[in-house]
């Protein structure tokens, strides 16, 4: 007969909720083979099997500046990716530093990583504790020369000095034949089959998971005293259950750890009293401006060339009639974007990852196919918009303009890939401001009548054509690729904080981020319609974007027309790079595939160049691209509302019931409007 204790003993331990970061300090850039990756795969594989969420990064792939300040761009360096990488460090309960031996010592990359960790060691968290408090650290070393223990002890000393908790047996390594002997993954090395290395790696991995789980446990669940010896009941207890020597040793160890935890808690709770000696993270976060950015990248999708076509057509044909649609669409979009960012912050997963996790492989492939088609249709529209702007400004052939747009957008993506998300956000935000200036500059010449503007806020239609344009505005505003992307942007920028003050703060900042970004995007969309209503109403040559440019030129002058074209160009360039970024995130989240950005750029550029070369009407193509986008809206918005309203997914941060109901209303309404757009377009 199997007892309950036997069943518990047989069940493998689970460490769900823990997150680990492995930093590989190899000197080889990706995709070169790193032998250290072999040991990382063994340890991280064990963690994944037991429920730990694992993140890995190769430090040499990133532009980490030399120095001992949190952000070296504030101390003379042009670029520094460490602030973005540091968020991944803070997101992890377990940090494992891994690297090779060089001349009997750690690599220069390892030393740089430790220096930058040291640079942030005086920062405090929201509870006034030092940043690395309550986290576990370990290391993995590979090489074919003496020094594995020397390197490991240097790393472990550094980690404990910085504030990490180091469990017993917190290191593992493999050392091959000294000299030019084989390295860990070389054929015949015996590295992956080495019992000693595998055993130590397993010990290290489980010790890290156990200590990290204990450090995260609520205080009430931690042991506070050693059990009294058998036969000697402690005060207030009935006679205790007899314990074995191994159980006593285990309890003593847990008690010692708990005592260390209480001592550290007492000391670190006084962190606010030693503010003069340490830089509080709240010093750099005392204003929320530092944390703004992800929503501004997502907002580019709301001012792309498709929006220009829909808004200008609406204003030229119906004046101020459909202004209310723009306002309503942006309010709905703000809710959708906030829910997307919230999902990324709370779960640590992008929307594609969260959806894919709940699907089998055939369903994931089908879902990925529709999402990628939508992302590619978006990218085609953005390239065409940029090509139109270049033809307006420089009289370039449309195919040449498309190539230039594709190349420039690739350069923007390179900024994100090489220089980090923060700089990418700054560049995209700058382009958003250029777009805003380009489409609002006309108000310095002629302002719309206030009464007419207020009249446009009253919901109403004038015939079937106005309904079609309203659906087009809605379809051009709530963009599926922006919904997918924003969840990943928020996670990558802010990390995945544990429940508590830090998460609440980041959610508040996210609401500000979304609110400000959507206010700018909504203002730009409204400006497009108002400019068209004021200057193009009744003209017969505004059916295309180029016709709208000429109308602006004739009514407002060359300067305003040039600014209009510059705004359109910035819209095409920025939205094209953001669309390609979203496509990569969709593929990574659903299929766990990564395609080089250049290859992806060429794939999506091909259809756009073919359309431009074959002489299809560019503006008509933009309209049709919005129809393709309409197919993807329900697949993005409906799962988002379901996931963020699920306590199983969001825990204590699940949507309020009212928010969920409003979310469902918005999701269904947007989906129905897009179905209507498809129907009206197909039926003419």
Swiss-Prot record:
GO MF assignments: cadmium ion transmembrane transporter activity; manganese ion transmembrane transporter activity; metal ion binding; oxidoreductase activity; symporter activity
InterPro entries per record: Flavoprotein-like_sf, FMN_Rdtase-like_dom, NRAMP_fam
Pfam families membership: FMN_red (PF03358), Nramp (PF01566)
Record membrane topology: Multi-pass membrane protein
Subcellular location: Cell membrane
Region named Disordered: 223-250
Gene Ontology terms describing biological process: iron ion transmembrane transport
GO cellular component: plasma membrane
Keyword Transport included in the entry's annotation: yes
Residue intervals passing through the bilayer: 283-303, 318-340, 365-387, 391-413, 427-446, 467-489, 514-534, 555-577, 597-616, 621-643, 656-678
Gene3D superfamilies: 3.40.50.360
Keywords: Cell membrane, Ion transport, Membrane, Symport, Transmembrane, Transmembrane helix, Transport
Family: In the C-terminal section; belongs to the NRAMP family.
Function: H(+)-stimulated, divalent metal cation uptake system.
PANTHER family registered for this protein in UniProt: NATURAL RESISTANCE-ASSOCIATED MACROPHAGE PROTEIN 2, SOLUTE CARRIER PROTEIN FAMILY 11 MEMBER
Protein name: Divalent metal cation transporter MntH
Organism: Mycobacterium bovis (strain ATCC BAA-935 / AF2122/97)
Gene that this sequence comes from: mntH
């Amino acid at each position: 007969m199997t007892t309950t204790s036997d069943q518990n003993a047989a069940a493998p331990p689970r460490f769900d909720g823990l997150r680990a970061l492995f930093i590989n300090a190899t000197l080889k850039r990706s995709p070169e083979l790193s032998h250290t990756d072999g040991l990382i795969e063994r340890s991280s594989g064990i963690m994944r099997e037991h429920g730990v969420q694992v993140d890995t990064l190769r430090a040499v792939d990133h532009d980490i500046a030399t120095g001992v300040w949190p952000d070296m761009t504030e101390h003379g360096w042009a670029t520094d990716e460490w602030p973005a990488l540091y968020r991944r460090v803070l997101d992890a309960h377990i940090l494992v530093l891994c690297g090779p031996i060089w001349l009997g010592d750690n690599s220069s990359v390892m030393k740089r990583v430790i220096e930058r960790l040291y640079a942030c060691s005086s920062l405090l968290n929201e509870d006034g504790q030092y940043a690395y408090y309550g986290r576990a650290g370990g290391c993995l070393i590979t090489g074919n020369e003496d020094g594995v223990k020397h390197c490991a002890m240097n790393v472990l000393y550094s980690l404990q000095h910085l504030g990490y908790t180091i469990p017993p047996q917190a290191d593992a390594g493999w050392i091959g034949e000294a000299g030019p002997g084989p390295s860990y993954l070389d054929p015949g090395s015996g590295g992956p089959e080495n019992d000693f290395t595998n055993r130590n790696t397993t010990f290290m991995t489980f010790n890290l998971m156990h200590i990290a789980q204990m450090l995260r446990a609520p205080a009430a669940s931690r042991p506070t005293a050693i059990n009294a010896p058998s036969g000697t009941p402690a005060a207030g207890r009935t006679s205790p259950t007899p314990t074995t020597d191994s159980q006593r040793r285990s309890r003593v160890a847990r008690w010692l750890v708990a005592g260390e935890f209480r001592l550290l808690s007492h000391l670190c709770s006084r962190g606010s009293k030693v503010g003069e000696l340490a830089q509080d993270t709240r010093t750099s976060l005392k204003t929320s401006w530092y944390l703004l950015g992800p929503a501004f990248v997502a907002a580019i999708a709301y001012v792309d060339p498709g929006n220009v076509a829909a808004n200008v057509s609406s204003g030229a044909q119906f004046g101020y009639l459909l202004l209310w649609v723009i306002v309503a669409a942006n309010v709905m979009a703000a809710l959708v974007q906030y829910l997307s960012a919230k999902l990324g912050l709370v779960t640590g997963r992008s929307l594609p990852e969260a959806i894919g996790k709940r699907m089998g492989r055939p369903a994931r492939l089908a879902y990925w196919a529709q999402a990628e088609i939508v992302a590619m249709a978006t990218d085609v529209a953005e390239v065409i918009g940029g090509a139109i702007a270049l033809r307006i400004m420089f009289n370039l052939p449309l195919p040449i303009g498309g190539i230039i747009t594709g190349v420039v957008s690739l350069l923007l993506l390179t900024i994100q890939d090489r220089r980090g998300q923060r700089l990418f956000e700054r560049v995209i935000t700058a382009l958003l401001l250029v777009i805003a200036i380009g489409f609002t500059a006309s108000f310095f010449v002629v302002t719309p009548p206030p009464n007419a503007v207020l009249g446009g806020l009253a919901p109403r239609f004038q015939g079937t054509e106005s309904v079609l344009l309203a659906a087009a505005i809605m379809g051009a505003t709530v963009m599926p690729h922006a919904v997918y992307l924003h969840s990943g942007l928020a996670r990558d920028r802010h990390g995945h904080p544990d429940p508590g003050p830090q998460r609440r703060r980041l959610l508040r900042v996210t609401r500000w981020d979304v609110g400000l970004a959507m206010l700018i995007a909504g203002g730009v969309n409204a400006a497009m319609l108002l400019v068209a209503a004021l200057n193009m109403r009744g003209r017969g040559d505004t059916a295309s974007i180029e016709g709208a440019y000429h109308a602006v030129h004739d009514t407002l002058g060359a300067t305003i027309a040039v600014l209009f074209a510059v705004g359109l160009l910035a819209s095409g360039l920025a939205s094209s790079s953001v669309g390609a970024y979203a496509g990569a995130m969709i593929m990574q989240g659903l299929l766990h595939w990564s395609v080089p950005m250049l290859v992806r750029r060429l794939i999506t550029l091909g259809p756009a160049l073919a359309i431009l070369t074959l002489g299809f009407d560019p503006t008509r193509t933009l309209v049709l691209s919005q129809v393709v986008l309409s197919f993807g809206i329900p697949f993005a918005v409906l799962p988002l509302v379901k996931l963020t309203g699920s306590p199983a997914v969001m825990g204590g941060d699940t949507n309020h019931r009212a928010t969920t109901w409003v979310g469902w209303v918005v999701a269904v309404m947007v989906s129905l409007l897009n179905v209507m757009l498809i129907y009206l377009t197909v039926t003419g």
